[in-house]
């Protein structure tokens, strides 16, 4: 497995399965990560996951992704979606293609959740499909980085 995809989970996603399950679903973050790793392995793709409640740690991991040779990033920036120019600048700085993923439909929620600092630079945005959104994003990323045979 030479190609690697990085999945970054933002603040409070460590509480998945416990925090507002009617909004975010009943799967834990570990459940989602394991499902994604299995999906990636089926295509001979390596998958790394990272979660932090700290903006700076997420920025550092994005920077490290370039050093590590990551080919694609899937990011659920959670609340940082609406506030973080730093995460936006980090993603632009490393120039790794990324997809923005949200479990809930942010456009059907509070008005402050309607703006994203990332979406205009993302390859795409997937929201409102629960954990399935990560799988949709991973399918696309695999297609983009896998050599055609």
From Swiss-Prot:
What EC number(s) are associated with this protein in UniProt? 4.2.1.10
Q: Where is the active site?
A: 24 (proton acceptor), 102 (proton donor)
Chain positions of site Transition state stabilizer: 19
Q: What class of enzyme is it?
A: lyase
Pathway(s) annotated for this protein in UniProt: Metabolic intermediate biosynthesis; chorismate biosynthesis; chorismate from D-erythrose 4-phosphate and phosphoenolpyruvate: step 3/7
Q: Where is substrate annotated to bind?
A: 76, 82, 89, 103-104, 113
> What SUPFAM superfamilies would the database entry show?
Type II 3-dehydroquinate dehydratase (SSF52304)
Q: Which domain of life is it from?
A: Bacteria
Pfam families (alphabetical): DHquinase_II
InterPro entries, alphabetically?
DHquinase_II, DHquinase_II_CS, DHquinase_II_sf
Keyword annotations: Amino-acid biosynthesis, Aromatic amino acid biosynthesis, Lyase
Can you list the disulfide-bonded cysteine pairs?
Answer: none
Q: Name one GO molecular function term.
A: 3-dehydroquinate dehydratase activity
Family per record = Belongs to the type-II 3-dehydroquinase family.
User: What quaternary structure, including any partners, is listed in this protein's UniProt entry?
Assistant: Homododecamer.
HAMAP family noted in UniProt: AroQ
| Function text | Catalyzes a trans-dehydration via an enolate intermediate.
Q: Output this protein's name.
A: 3-dehydroquinate dehydratase
Source organism of this protein record: Acinetobacter baylyi (strain ATCC 33305 / BD413 / ADP1)
Q: Which gene encodes it?
A: aroQ
């Amino acid at each position: 497995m030479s190609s690697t995809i990085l999945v970054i989970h933002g603040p409070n996603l460590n509480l998945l399965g416990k925090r507002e399950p009617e909004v975010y679903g009943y799967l834990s973050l570990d459940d989602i990560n394991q499902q994604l790793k299995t999906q990636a392995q089926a295509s001979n793709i390596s998958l790394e996951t990272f979660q932090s409640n700290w903006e700076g740690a997420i920025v550092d991991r994005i920077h490290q992704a370039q050093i590590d040779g990551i080919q694609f990033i899937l990011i659920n920036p959670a609340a940082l979606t609406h506030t973080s120019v730093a995460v936006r600048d980090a993603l632009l700085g490393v120039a790794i293609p990324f997809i923005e993923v949200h479990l809930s439909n942010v456009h059907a929620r509070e008005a402050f959740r309607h703006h994203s600092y990332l979406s205009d630079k993302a390859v795409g945005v997937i929201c409102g499909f629960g954990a399935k959104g990560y799988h949709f994003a991973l399918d696309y990323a695999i297609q983009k980085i896998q050599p055609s045979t």
